[in-house]
Amino acid sequence: MNILIINQPVFNRGDESAHKGLIRTLLKRFPDAIIKVMHEASLSESYRQYAVKDKRVEYFSEVEGCIKFPRFRNYDVYTNHTWLWKWHPTYRRMESIYKWADVVVCAPGGICMGGFQDWNHLYHLRLAQLFKRPLAYYGRSFGPFPTETERNRQFKKISLDMLHYFGYLSIRDHKLNCWQMS
């Protein structure tokens, strides 16, 4: 089994502990698994400190595109024009990474889907959806969503759409009930 881990926060010891626990549990449960952990290039040093030392685990930097691609991709997530990505070389390189994976796991920690409204976080989740990869959303905080601006409302809409795509979801049930999900 090939497992791709995305969106791993590296900002505190709790994130580190959750990451190491997830990796060790996956390796124990799936001894033949190969795990790749994709991270932002700017966070490489943090990942060196987090790394689980095992021959079945590989850490690598996210594909870096042209300087305008992050702005382009985040705008396209916002406007739901993700079909434009297929012409961008960075997107095509990301496609090969995601299609390698049998399952994509959004790593534990962070509140990127809610208060922080991290469009990069949504971008990586949308890639898994676009490439039809099974997606597990594990041990994350989710919401609350501010709704003051159009951008806030669009982020909430896309986030809730993604919530229905996840094959495995591990967040607090109380929070789901607050959104009157069915």
Predicted feature descriptions by range:
Residues 1-150, 154-161:
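Aromatic- and Gly/Pro-rich donor/ligand-binding loops
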Residues 167-182:
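A short, active-site helix/loop in glycosyltransferases that binds the activated sugar's phosphate group
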Residues 164:
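Basic phosphate/pyrophosphate-binding loop/patch that engages nucleotide-derived ligands
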